[in-house]
Amino acid sequence: MFKQFLSKLPRKSSKSDSGELNRSSSGPVSSPVQRSGTSGGGSGPVRSNSGKRMSSAVFPASVVAGIEPLVPFKDVPSSEKLNLFVSKVSLCCVTFDFSDPGKNSIEKDVKRQTLLELLDFVASGSVKFTEPAILAMCRMCAVNLFRVFPPNYRSSSGGENDDDEPMFDPAWPHLQIVYDLLLKFITSPCLDAKVAKKYLDHAFIVRLLDLFDSEDPRERECLKTILHRVYGKFMVHRPFVRKSMSNIFYRFVFETEKHSGIAELLEIFGSIVSGFALPLKEEHKIFLWRVLIPLHKPKSVGNYFQQLSYCITQFIDKEPKLGSVVIKGLLKFWPITNSQKEVMFLGEVEEIVEAMSVMEFQKIMVPLFLRIACCVTSSHFQVSERALFLWNNDQIVNLIGHNRQAILPIMFTALEKNAQNHWNQSVLNLTLNVRKMFCEMDEALFMSCHARFKEDEAKQCSAAEKRKEVWARLENAASMKPITGKTAVLVTPRATSIAC
């Protein structure tokens, strides 16, 4: 088997091969390697001849120089090191099935040692990479890394399935070295971005982004670092990277609600947003409105909420006027039936409102505190507690104080109902503290609201008594003359202004 493994390596290139190299090096790669459903990074069986022909069409094998790949770098002169590099890289294009640890163990070890040699060589930065070397490297990474993942049948319900164990790829010992090699290669000062951009092109980047759907968290962590370096080094690709990431978010929010790497992608985008120049471009604001705010909608938002909040905070730090836009978006996607999400939303609201000016706060205070009033009276004590904790924030209390004429009438009924009826002692104590705070803030306004509350309460009691009397008369009339035949009964439901 070892002889068969070595026999796969190309020998001394012919003149026709050299001509093909010149032709292939003159233009960029048009598309990445298209792979069938084998597991990647060598985790599937050795590819068929048709698969190799397809790979050769994209990254031609003729770039391989005629030099023995198992020779150490230290044993060849400097003039031959790049040829040896290309030869070793081509050796690593052979893949194996890692689901069976005992299969092809010698060949796997040879490949692993070769990858480690390549890693040391790239890290040394001793030779400037030529176009054939870049081409061979991209081809090897495509063959080993790019693959189609099996369908993900896990639930997208987020926090409800936190006990799910992460899936680990059996090929990771090899995949990790390939990822480390790609990272060292991209960040190497010996790599000319102007030349490499022809091979690390849009198609390569799209396939790299597809790998973020891997269920192996180790792979996603490596991809996060690599994509960040690609974004930093290849400025010409930056708009395309942002657009491709947006497409992944769109597909996740509006179609599938299933993706393993949303948190990692958002983490990358957070660092991208922090580098945006001022004033913000319209396309960046559109990304906030159409992508980041709708990302609050999926059930699995808890899996990436921290990274999402960071991205939004970065936008607001860049342009504080966006705070009111974000609050309106949060109110639009407010999770009325999901208490855990409500707690998270309240935390994000606090972070945003804390940084708002009085003018921006006034734009959203009425709808915001209508929602907060509903949260305060929630029977779920964590929601009610988190809403009342807003009054522990001095900056928010200061904003409320400046606008108490509008906010206290909204909140008063919720506070009184809590003080009278809430079952949780902690919520009851917090309610009384907030109530006392409002009273000390403006006693005259507080007493006015209290009088109005008592008046409304009396009206409600009176209306309830009238309804009771009407029903009593109806029941009395019905008992004297029972309904006969097909008598239509019209019932009109009472409309409500806001759902709590």
Curated annotation (Swiss-Prot):
Compositionally biased residues, Polar residues: 21-37
GO cellular component, one term: protein phosphatase type 2A complex
UniProt superkingdom: Eukaryota
Compartments it resides in: Cytoplasm
Keyword annotations: Cytoplasm
Major localisation: cytoplasm
Record-level Gene Ontology MF annotations: protein phosphatase regulator activity
SUPFAM superfamilies (UniProt xref): ARM repeat
UniProt xrefs under Pfam families: B56
Any GO BP annotation: signal transduction
Region Disordered, annotated ranges: 1-53
PANTHER family reported for this sequence: SERINE/THREONINE PROTEIN PHOSPHATASE 2A PP2A REGULATORY SUBUNIT B, SERINE_THREONINE PROTEIN PHOSPHATASE 2A 57 KDA REGULATORY SUBUNIT B' KAPPA ISOFORM
Protein's name according to its UniProt entry: Serine/threonine protein phosphatase 2A 57 kDa regulatory subunit B' kappa isoform
Species name: Arabidopsis thaliana (Mouse-ear cress)
